[in-house]
Amino acid sequence: MFDKINKTLDFNQNLLNLYAKRQEILSSNIANADTPNYKAMDINFKDEMDKITKKSNLDITLTKTSSHHLNPRKKNFFIFEVKPITSKEIQSNGNTVDMNRERIEFIKNTLKYEENLVFIKNEIKNIMNVLKG
């Protein structure tokens, strides 16, 4: 039972990390909308989601270089592949940021992040109710 709970929470934690990283990328694109030659970036959400589902990157281990370092209990490390967005519209200064796309993706990503937080909150609430009896 606890293994299933742990897997559910780990999956959702990794999903939150993915949404947070994407939010950083989208924010950077918006902030650099007027920067000459800036290339808009993003992650392929489906590919990164597949990595989380398959847990292919969870085997990364840390090396202790000091006896004062803590031993990691969880392997929750993902290396997200950030790629330039192929844009149909390139500004005269070489910038490829499409503000309409960035705003829409930013809002969608924010809503998905919040939705996942609510899901985790409800899962924890349900677990607490079961434990209380």
UniProtKB/Swiss-Prot annotation:
It comes from Buchnera aphidicola subsp. Schizaphis graminum (strain Sg). The basal body constitutes a major portion of the flagellar organelle and consists of a number of rings mounted on a central rod. In Gram-negative bacteria, at least four rings, L, P, S and M are present, whereas Gram-positive bacteria lack the L and P rings. The rod consists of about 26 subunits of FlgG in the distal portion, and FlgB, FlgC and FlgF build up the proximal portion of the rod with about 6 subunits each. The lineage of its organism: Bacteria, Pseudomonadati, Pseudomonadota, Gammaproteobacteria, Enterobacterales. Structural component of flagellum, the bacterial motility apparatus. Part of the rod structure of flagellar basal body. GO terms for cellular component: bacterial-type flagellum basal body, rod. It comes from the Bacteria. GO terms for biological process: bacterial-type flagellum-dependent cell motility. Pfam families: Flg_bb_rod (PF00460). Keywords: Bacterial flagellum. Belongs to the flagella basal body rod proteins family. The gene is flgB. This is Flagellar basal body rod protein FlgB.
